[in-house]
Amino acid sequence: MLYPFIKALLILIASSLPLALSRADERPNIIIILCDDLGYGDLSCYGNTVIRTPNIDQLASEGIRFTSFYSSSPVCSPSRVGLMTGRTPDRAGVYDWIPRGNRMHMSKNEFTMPVMLKKTGYATCMSGKWHCNGLFNQINQPQPGDFGFDHWFATQNNAAPSHKDPENFVRNGKSVGMSKGFCCQIVA
């Protein structure tokens, strides 16, 4: 008597397995945009009536908008490290803005958000201003790929010699030379 019940239960489980597997692939995309010196009220999706931000507004309307958030630091390098690690930046090795050529950098053994996402099957990418070390694209300090990014396209701090046609972008550890256009369009 128990055998037909177990057989029916196994058939039910086996037939629902493809549905469960297909839903496992329906994870949301995660896009984090970090901008230096951007305040809560600077975006029109948060109420600014002077500055228009239609592309960010569209992302906000189709995704999740956070209304209670804090920066781990008022300057760029530590705020990036705090966001990636979830820790107080000085505990991760970065306590201030990092000038080019400086020895300060995020500790290589930090457990970062990209590492966590990779462990759950996400592909990870970083594009734009890195600024988590002073010796960018040098073996003396860890680089974006060491913190869980499958692909990265970045500068250490600012585009140079200017934001138009910058020459200092690096893709996965290799210099790309001059890139035509404005850096904000190139990294997007």
Model segments located where?
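Formylglycine-dependent sulfatase
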Residues: L2, K7, S15-S16, L21-A188
